[in-house]
Structure formats: C-alpha cells, structure tokens
Amino acid sequence: GLNIKDTRRQIMLYSDGTLDIELEETTHMLDEVTITSGRIQNVKSTQLGAETLRPTQLKNIPMALGEVDILKMVQALPGVKTVGEASSGFNVRGGATDQNLILLNDGTIYNPNHLFGFFAAFNSDMVKEAEIYKSSIPAQYGGRISSILDITGKEANKEKFTGSAGIGLVTSKLNLEIPIIKDRTSVLLSGRTTYSDWIMKQLPEKSGYKNGTAGFYDLATIVAHKFNDKHSLNVYGYYSHDRFAFNSNEKYGYNNLNASARWRAVFNEKLIGYFSAGYDHYDYNNRETVNASAAYKLSFDINQYFVKADFTNILADKHTLNFGFKSMLYHINSGTYEPEGSESFVKKDVLQKDKALETAFYLGDEWEITPKLSVNAGIRYSLFSALGPRSYYQYASGMLPHESTITDTITAGAGKFMKTYHGPEFRLSARYAFTDNFSVKAGFNSMRQYIHKLSNTV
C-alpha cells in the first residue's frame, strides 16, 4: 500500500483461522522538482531575440488546411515576416530567405516548404522543440547572416509503445514510438502524405490549372540508444518529396534528404561533449514536354557532408565555456539542361560542378559576473575554400570581366585550393538587471555567409 512499509511473515497453515498483522508507515522521498517562469528567465538571460518553441504551443497558431505548422509559430514572432499568404517561408528583419539557416537534427534543410509553401517540410509530431535566434546568435552557429532556426526531433518513449494518427482535409499522418530495449533503445517513425490533387480539380477551366496535380510526402526516423548515464547515441533520418504540375506537359519536383548521427559523452561533472556527422542533400528538377522536339529536363542538386564537435565546460557555478568546430564539404551540381525524350533536339549543357570546404572554430564564454551583470561573449573563425577540379577565366588587368577581356583559361586540379576566404565573427551580449523583474540588454553580432541562392524574379 501507499506509505506502508513492506512486512514479511512466515506462516504454517494447519486449519482455518485469522491472523492480524500490524503494518508500519513509511515515508517516500521524492526527487527535487524545480519550477521556473519563462518570463523571469527572459529577464535573467543575456540572449536577445531568442525564442524556444514547442509543439504544445501550436494550438495557439492558426492552421492552414487543418495542418498545424511550427513555421507559422516562427512567422508570428517579432521581426519575422512571411514571404506570402499561407506560405512557410520567412524573412527576418529585412533579410532574404536564403539568409536563414534551418537545421533539423544538425542537418541543413534547404527548402522547408511543401505544396507551394502551405505546409512546413517536417511533421510537427516528431518535433521536440525549435530554437530561433534573430540576434545575439551563439558562437556555435554560423553560415548565414540573418537568423538560425535549430529544430530538434524528439526521442521515442523507451518504456511503452505509443502512436498517433491524423486525417485532415488534404493530408494524413502517422507517428509511432517503439521501445526496442526497455529504458535503453527506442525508435520513432513518422510519416505524412497528401491527397491534394482534388483542390486543383476545383479550379475553373479558364485558370489553366484544372488539370494540374500536386502532392508531397515526408518520412522521418530517430533511433535513440542509451549506453549508460554518460554515453548515448542518436541516429536521425529524414526524407521529403514534392511534385507538382500545372498541366500535363510541365512538371516540377524537389527532394530533401538528411542522415546524421550524434553521440553525447559526459566526460566528468564539468565537461560534456557532443559529436555529430552527417549528409545533407537537396535537388530540384523541371520537365517541359509541350513540344516534343523542344522537350527538356532542367535539374540541379546540392550535396554536403559535415562533421562537428561541441563541448561545454562548466568552469564554475555561474561560468561556462563552450567551444568546438564544424566542417562541411560541398558538392554542388549547378545545373544540367538535357533533352527529354528521343524526339527532342535540345542540346545537352552541363555547368561546371562546384566543390568547396567550409570550416569554423568557435569559443564562447557565459559568465554571470554579479547577480546584476551577465556577459555572453564569443568568437568564431570561419574559412571557405573553393576546390578543384574547375576551370576559370583570367581577365585583362583593370578591365571589367567580359568575354572580350579574357586573357587565359586556368584549370585547377582535383582537390586544389583555388581561393580561400576567411575571417573572424564576433558575438557579444550583456544583461544588467536593475530589479528582479527589469533588466536592460545589449548585443552585437558579426556574421559571414559564403553560399547564396540566386532567384529569378523576372
């Protein structure tokens, strides 16, 4: 019984009878529970423009076509502006969409949208939390100059099987949490698909889109294993596919793919390490077959491989050091234009492939100097190197780059460092508390972005 001490008695039964046993009360010690207020924490923190978003908050966000969307939460934050109605793309304080770094379990998501931007590319049921930094960006993040959106997937229940499913106007989804080894290993499986073609059928004939089609699906899995209290390993997988056509002769499609692994190691009470490695992929294609003799396929893709290590060293009760590095190898197929079908006279054209290496080292220091004054300072040093094989032109000195001013063509061999760009990035934020409920913050960031998206706005 509750609050009753276990008692054992040895009994020899010879006949029917009654035995009264006196039980003693006991006390159960509960683990300490700390309850904090988010508003008070915001006053105490040195971070500016940082928000932590959780799926439980989604109920307060308007739904698009019956689907909850974590990116809609992002768009509702100060300084964030949507790029269009019912769209999941966003701009942060005047920045462009390609100046936002979107991470899912350490992997880069290049296109976070489904179905013309009506839905986010990831199922909210598999999201544990999302952190967005619009200013005072920690030194561990880099590569974009506007904002960082870091999304973490949740681990499945390690004790019992759970699942959920949903059917909406245009989408259906399934989420399963499967324990493999109790309290040690679990697998999360999440999937979502659409049956949105019926929307296109409702459009008037004169729109030209009545015979169009559109659809998507995404799949995610998280395998979590706990070796012991000091070591754990998570393996992540994610894939999304979109296809749409405005008519039977013009088709579009794109895909996201991420695979990564993360190992957490507690070296001692003051030093924790996180080690990650993974692969990210994004591709896009467009097929035009309205005229068989001019039918073509246009495609490009981005592939990147990354390794990273992050360390947290607790120097004192209110003094923490963060340091680490990240390195990414890019393979970019800038574009392929080729005939579609045997009757096409289109001449195949393949742009040169780009290869680059981006590496950064960082050091951050969080220090509560006094109960009133806290400082978060950091430095990140990044390097971006364009690699061979590649051919490039040399132009006449003092002349603008043009075909008529080309003086030579230089070919760089495989793996050769053609050009390296590098420099420091400084991060600083401070907080001074006048009272327990009122503080003033200030911050400064310098950021570097080496890869950009060129958009056709004509």
Where are these regions (language model features)?
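Signature of Gram-negative outer-membrane beta-barrel scaffolds
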Residues: 322-435, 450-451, 455
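Transmembrane beta-barrel wall of Gram-negative outer-membrane proteins
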Residues: 170-193, 207-243, 251-279, 315-316, ...
